[in-house]
């Protein structure tokens, strides 16, 4: 037998005699898929990647934005959690709404939220963003940004401390870790 025939024999896939006993078993029933092992592993991998690389887009409307900037400074350093502030909604997956949301700003908030790619999350920071705050009874104030966009985490306070925002971000990471994207 020549060299070419030997290489050709090695490179050709063998023909199976019967049903292939593969891990997924396309012809038969798969015990792994029935119990959800494969999809939960993929969910865990995706959620691990999402919690380690959250990119928030800041939507600072009032004094709470100063505390949000303080959270990104050297003392608390959000970079060690994998959090990098992004200026564009198309590059971010978390929106932090900080401050008083007025009626004229509500359509802009919704437009920015709609421009974010899925999956996306929202953190409402401060009493004004949570429920109107001090200006709750004003005719021009939206009584909570949850009337405009779905909110995942509420950070209370007027203004909330930077540590409270970091705690809210950690709570959002726990929430992301518990979500089931594929096996759901």
From Swiss-Prot:
Query: What's noted on cofactor binding?
Result: Binds 1 [4Fe-4S] cluster.
**If you read the UniProt record, what top EC class would you report for this enzyme, in one word?**
translocase
Any one Gene Ontology MF annotation carried by this entry is: quinone binding
Q: Name one GO cellular component term.
A: respiratory chain complex I
From the Swiss-Prot or TrEMBL record, state where the protein is found.
Cell inner membrane
Question: Which UniProt key words apply to this protein?
Answer: 4Fe-4S, Cell inner membrane, Cell membrane, Iron, Iron-sulfur, Membrane, Metal-binding, NAD, Quinone, Translocase, Transport, Ubiquinone
Instruction: Please list the cofactors this protein needs.
Output: [4Fe-4S] cluster
The family database entries (Pfam families) matched by this protein are listed as:
Oxidored_q6
| EC annotation from Swiss-Prot or TrEMBL | 7.1.1.-
* GO BP terms in the entry: aerobic respiration; electron transport coupled proton transport
Similarity comment: Belongs to the complex I 20 kDa subunit family.
* Protein role: NDH-1 shuttles electrons from NADH, via FMN and iron-sulfur (Fe-S) centers, to quinones in the respiratory chain. The immediate electron acceptor for the enzyme in this species is believed to be ubiquinone. Couples the redox reaction to proton translocation (for every two electrons transferred, four hydrogen ions are translocated across the cytoplasmic membrane), and thus conserves the redox energy in a proton gradient.
For this protein, the record's PANTHER family field holds: NADH DEHYDROGENASE, NADH DEHYDROGENASE [UBIQUINONE] IRON-SULFUR PROTEIN 7, MITOCHONDRIAL
* Name listed for the protein in its UniProt record: NADH-quinone oxidoreductase subunit B
Native source species = Xylella fastidiosa (strain Temecula1 / ATCC 700964)
